[in-house]
Design a protein with these regions (language model features):
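Double-stranded beta-helix
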Residues: 1, 8, 13-14, 74-111
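Short acidic-glycine-tyrosine-enriched beta hairpin
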Residues: 53-70
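A short glycine-rich, His/Asp/Glu-containing loop-to-beta-strand
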Residues: 1-30, 37
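Short, conserved beta-strand element in jelly-roll/cupin
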Residues: 20-24, 33-49, 88-91
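Histidine-centered divalent metal-coordination motifs
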Residues: 32-34, 73-75
């Protein structure tokens, strides 16, 4: 997984963070949540996104997905395709903007 920051807060009161994130085939994040939510805009390849307890969603370039505040989820590339997305979120103080949890198992990833 490669992360390239695009935008971050520069002035008092600004909270938006934007990054380009690239995934090799089969690569994915760990389970995590965001205090103020997260928006993902797919730019290349095939993305897999899943909220805990929900069905895995497949997304393609041009599609935008939203993960609500506090929703545990993971995202990554499909098993046979590179994937790139823009990740956008507002930073938060308490709790932190991103709370990282356990790794996504191969069984969870492939289900």
């Amino acid at each position: 997984v490669w992360l390239d920051p695009i935008a971050s807060p520069r002035e008092v009161g600004q909270r938006m963070v934007v990054a380009k994130v690239r995934f090799a085939p089969g690569a994915r994040t760990a389970w995590h949540s965001h205090a103020l939510g997260q928006t993902l805009h797919i730019t290349q390849g095939v993305a897999w996104v899943q909220s805990r307890g929900g069905a895995k969603v497949e997304a393609y370039p041009g599609q935008t997905l939203y993960c609500p505040p506090g929703e545990e989820h993971w995202h990554g590339a499909s098993a046979d395709s590179f994937m790139e997305h823009l990740a956008m979120l507002d930073t938060a103080d308490h709790p932190p903007a991103t709370t990282w949890l356990e790794h996504v198992t191969d069984e969870e990833y492939l289900s």
